[in-house]
Protein backbone atom coordinates (compact mmCIF):
# COMPACT_ATOMS: atom_id res chain seq x y z
CA UNK A 1 0.00 0.00 0.00
CA UNK A 2 3.06 2.30 0.29
CA UNK A 3 2.94 2.96 -3.46
CA UNK A 4 -0.73 3.99 -3.36
CA UNK A 5 -1.84 7.56 -3.98
CA UNK A 6 -4.91 8.13 -1.82
CA UNK A 7 -4.86 11.94 -1.59
CA UNK A 8 -6.64 14.38 -3.90
CA UNK A 9 -10.30 13.68 -3.13
CA UNK A 10 -12.49 16.71 -2.56
CA UNK A 11 -15.45 17.33 -0.24
CA UNK A 12 -17.58 20.46 -0.32
CA UNK A 13 -19.32 21.68 2.86
CA UNK A 14 -22.08 24.28 2.62
CA UNK A 15 -23.44 26.03 5.73
CA UNK A 16 -27.23 26.11 5.35
CA UNK A 17 -27.79 27.88 8.67
CA UNK A 18 -29.36 26.55 11.85
CA UNK A 19 -26.40 24.22 12.40
CA UNK A 20 -27.28 22.37 9.19
CA UNK A 21 -24.67 21.51 6.56
CA UNK A 22 -24.75 20.09 3.05
CA UNK A 23 -21.90 17.70 2.30
CA UNK A 24 -21.05 16.92 -1.33
CA UNK A 25 -18.60 14.15 -2.12
CA UNK A 26 -18.19 13.43 -5.80
CA UNK A 27 -21.69 12.97 -7.25
CA UNK A 28 -23.39 12.41 -3.88
CA UNK A 29 -24.80 15.01 -1.44
CA UNK A 30 -26.24 14.68 2.07
CA UNK A 31 -27.73 17.31 4.39
CA UNK A 32 -26.70 16.82 8.02
CA UNK A 33 -27.97 18.60 11.14
CA UNK A 34 -24.97 18.91 13.47
CA UNK A 35 -26.79 18.23 16.75
CA UNK A 36 -25.26 14.87 17.71
CA UNK A 37 -28.20 12.78 16.47
CA UNK A 38 -28.00 10.09 13.79
CA UNK A 39 -28.90 11.56 10.39
CA UNK A 40 -29.78 9.40 7.35
CA UNK A 41 -27.42 9.51 4.38
CA UNK A 42 -27.69 8.83 0.68
CA UNK A 43 -26.82 5.12 0.84
CA UNK A 44 -28.64 3.98 3.97
CA UNK A 45 -26.01 4.63 6.62
CA UNK A 46 -26.27 7.33 9.31
CA UNK A 47 -23.92 10.13 10.35
CA UNK A 48 -23.94 12.09 13.58
CA UNK A 49 -21.99 15.32 14.05
CA UNK A 50 -21.55 16.84 17.49
CA UNK A 51 -19.75 20.20 17.75
CA UNK A 52 -17.05 20.24 20.41
CA UNK A 53 -16.20 23.93 20.54
CA UNK A 54 -15.87 26.26 17.55
CA UNK A 55 -13.14 24.32 15.74
CA UNK A 56 -13.86 20.66 16.49
CA UNK A 57 -16.47 18.13 15.43
CA UNK A 58 -17.08 14.59 16.65
CA UNK A 59 -18.45 12.39 13.84
CA UNK A 60 -19.82 8.84 14.05
CA UNK A 61 -20.87 6.77 11.02
CA UNK A 62 -23.16 3.76 11.55
CA UNK A 63 -24.84 1.03 9.54
CA UNK A 64 -27.94 -0.62 11.03
CA UNK A 65 -27.03 0.96 14.35
CA UNK A 66 -23.50 -0.50 14.40
CA UNK A 67 -20.58 1.92 14.51
CA UNK A 68 -18.47 1.76 11.34
CA UNK A 69 -16.14 4.61 12.23
CA UNK A 70 -15.75 7.40 14.74
CA UNK A 71 -13.52 10.43 14.28
CA UNK A 72 -12.72 13.98 15.23
CA UNK A 73 -12.48 16.85 12.74
CA UNK A 74 -10.17 19.64 13.89
CA UNK A 75 -10.10 22.99 12.08
CA UNK A 76 -6.83 24.91 12.22
CA UNK A 77 -6.77 28.38 13.78
CA UNK A 78 -6.19 30.01 10.38
CA UNK A 79 -9.06 28.00 8.84
CA UNK A 80 -6.87 26.63 6.04
CA UNK A 81 -6.61 22.98 7.06
CA UNK A 82 -8.66 20.20 8.62
CA UNK A 83 -7.22 17.18 10.39
CA UNK A 84 -9.35 14.06 10.77
CA UNK A 85 -8.31 11.34 13.23
CA UNK A 86 -10.40 8.27 13.80
CA UNK A 87 -10.90 4.53 14.00
CA UNK A 88 -12.73 2.22 11.60
CA UNK A 89 -14.38 -0.97 12.88
CA UNK A 90 -14.65 -3.68 10.24
CA UNK A 91 -17.34 -6.40 10.12
CA UNK A 92 -14.86 -9.06 11.26
CA UNK A 93 -14.23 -7.05 14.44
CA UNK A 94 -10.77 -5.76 13.57
CA UNK A 95 -10.03 -2.04 13.68
CA UNK A 96 -7.86 0.39 11.74
CA UNK A 97 -6.86 3.90 12.76
CA UNK A 98 -6.72 6.62 10.14
CA UNK A 99 -5.38 10.15 9.84
CA UNK A 100 -6.41 12.51 7.03
CA UNK A 101 -5.19 16.06 6.40
CA UNK A 102 -7.23 18.34 4.13
CA UNK A 103 -6.48 21.79 2.73
CA UNK A 104 -8.96 24.47 1.79
CA UNK A 105 -9.36 24.94 -1.96
CA UNK A 106 -10.65 28.36 -2.98
CA UNK A 107 -12.75 30.65 -0.81
CA UNK A 108 -14.72 29.95 2.35
CA UNK A 109 -14.51 30.40 6.09
CA UNK A 110 -15.00 28.16 9.07
CA UNK A 111 -16.12 24.69 7.98
CA UNK A 112 -17.69 25.96 4.77
CA UNK A 113 -15.82 25.52 1.51
CA UNK A 114 -14.13 22.90 -0.67
CA UNK A 115 -11.61 20.66 1.06
CA UNK A 116 -9.02 18.45 -0.66
CA UNK A 117 -7.14 15.63 1.05
CA UNK A 118 -3.36 16.05 1.00
CA UNK A 119 -2.30 13.18 3.24
CA UNK A 120 -4.16 9.91 3.98
CA UNK A 121 -2.81 7.21 6.30
CA UNK A 122 -4.27 3.93 7.63
CA UNK A 123 -2.64 1.68 10.23
CA UNK A 124 -4.04 -1.52 8.71
CA UNK A 125 -3.84 -2.26 4.96
CA UNK A 126 -6.72 -3.94 3.14
CA UNK A 127 -6.41 -7.47 1.79
CA UNK A 128 -8.21 -8.98 -1.19
CA UNK A 129 -8.72 -12.55 -2.30
CA UNK A 130 -9.41 -13.05 -6.01
CA UNK A 131 -10.57 -16.41 -7.36
CA UNK A 132 -11.96 -17.82 -10.60
CA UNK A 133 -15.74 -17.68 -11.00
CA UNK A 134 -17.97 -19.53 -13.48
CA UNK A 135 -15.35 -20.09 -16.15
CA UNK A 136 -13.94 -16.74 -17.22
CA UNK A 137 -15.30 -14.64 -14.34
CA UNK A 138 -13.72 -13.59 -11.05
CA UNK A 139 -14.79 -13.41 -7.41
CA UNK A 140 -13.41 -10.49 -5.38
CA UNK A 141 -13.50 -11.11 -1.64
CA UNK A 142 -12.38 -8.73 1.12
CA UNK A 143 -12.44 -10.93 4.25
CA UNK A 144 -12.22 -8.14 6.84
CA UNK A 145 -15.31 -6.49 5.35
CA UNK A 146 -17.07 -9.80 4.51
CA UNK A 147 -17.68 -8.26 1.10
CA UNK A 148 -18.05 -10.47 -2.00
CA UNK A 149 -18.47 -9.62 -5.67
CA UNK A 150 -18.69 -12.43 -8.24
CA UNK A 151 -18.83 -11.19 -11.82
CA UNK A 152 -18.15 -11.97 -15.44
CA UNK A 153 -16.79 -9.39 -17.85
CA UNK A 154 -19.65 -9.23 -20.31
CA UNK A 155 -20.92 -5.70 -19.61
CA UNK A 156 -23.78 -6.94 -17.42
CA UNK A 157 -24.45 -5.76 -13.85
CA UNK A 158 -23.47 -8.12 -11.01
CA UNK A 159 -24.53 -7.50 -7.41
CA UNK A 160 -22.01 -6.88 -4.65
CA UNK A 161 -22.90 -8.34 -1.26
CA UNK A 162 -21.72 -7.64 2.29
CA UNK A 163 -22.94 -6.28 5.65
CA UNK A 164 -21.80 -2.72 4.88
CA UNK A 165 -22.48 -2.69 1.15
CA UNK A 166 -25.09 -0.16 0.05
CA UNK A 167 -28.34 -1.77 -1.21
CA UNK A 168 -28.45 -2.34 -4.98
CA UNK A 169 -24.67 -2.02 -5.42
CA UNK A 170 -23.64 -3.47 -8.78
CA UNK A 171 -20.57 -3.71 -10.98
CA UNK A 172 -20.21 -4.23 -14.72
CA UNK A 173 -16.94 -4.76 -16.54
CA UNK A 174 -14.91 -5.87 -19.52
CA UNK A 175 -11.49 -7.37 -20.17
CA UNK A 176 -9.21 -4.96 -22.03
CA UNK A 177 -6.34 -7.45 -22.32
CA UNK A 178 -4.97 -10.41 -20.29
CA UNK A 179 -3.62 -8.01 -17.63
CA UNK A 180 -6.29 -5.29 -17.56
CA UNK A 181 -9.95 -5.02 -16.52
CA UNK A 182 -12.26 -2.03 -16.61
CA UNK A 183 -15.16 -1.97 -14.12
CA UNK A 184 -18.01 0.51 -13.58
CA UNK A 185 -19.52 0.58 -10.08
CA UNK A 186 -23.08 1.75 -9.39
CA UNK A 187 -25.61 2.09 -6.58
CA UNK A 188 -29.27 1.93 -7.59
CA UNK A 189 -28.20 2.50 -11.19
CA UNK A 190 -26.21 5.65 -10.40
CA UNK A 191 -22.61 5.42 -11.61
CA UNK A 192 -20.18 6.21 -8.78
CA UNK A 193 -16.83 5.38 -10.36
CA UNK A 194 -14.88 3.77 -13.15
CA UNK A 195 -12.04 1.53 -11.97
CA UNK A 196 -9.16 0.03 -13.94
CA UNK A 197 -7.50 -3.15 -12.61
CA UNK A 198 -3.97 -3.77 -13.90
CA UNK A 199 -1.80 -6.76 -13.01
CA UNK A 200 1.94 -6.24 -13.49
CA UNK A 201 3.77 -8.35 -16.08
CA UNK A 202 5.48 -10.34 -13.32
CA UNK A 203 2.13 -10.94 -11.60
CA UNK A 204 3.34 -9.54 -8.28
CA UNK A 205 1.29 -6.35 -8.03
CA UNK A 206 -2.29 -5.27 -8.72
CA UNK A 207 -2.91 -1.56 -9.36
CA UNK A 208 -6.38 -0.02 -9.14
CA UNK A 209 -6.94 3.37 -10.75
CA UNK A 210 -10.26 4.74 -9.48
CA UNK A 211 -11.95 7.67 -11.21
CA UNK A 212 -14.89 8.75 -9.09
CA UNK A 213 -17.66 10.78 -10.70
CA UNK A 214 -17.36 14.42 -9.63
CA UNK A 215 -13.79 14.11 -8.34
CA UNK A 216 -10.99 16.04 -10.08
CA UNK A 217 -8.27 13.43 -9.53
CA UNK A 218 -7.99 9.66 -9.75
CA UNK A 219 -6.97 7.52 -6.78
CA UNK A 220 -4.31 4.83 -7.16
CA UNK A 221 -4.25 1.78 -4.88
CA UNK A 222 -1.41 -0.74 -5.22
CA UNK A 223 -1.67 -4.26 -3.77
CA UNK A 224 1.26 -6.67 -3.41
CA UNK A 225 0.65 -10.38 -3.98
CA UNK A 226 1.14 -12.50 -0.87
Feature names for model-found ranges:
Residues 1-226:
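Hydrophobic small-molecule pocket/channel-lining residues, especially in calycin-type beta-barrels
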Amino acid sequence: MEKSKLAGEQTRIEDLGGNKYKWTYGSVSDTILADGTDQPTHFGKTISIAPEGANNWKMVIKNDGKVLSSMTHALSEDGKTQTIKGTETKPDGTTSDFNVVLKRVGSGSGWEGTWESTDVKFTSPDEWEIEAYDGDGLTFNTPAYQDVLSMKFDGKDYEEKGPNVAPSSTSAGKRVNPHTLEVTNKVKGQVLDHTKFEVSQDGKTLTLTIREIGQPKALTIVYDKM
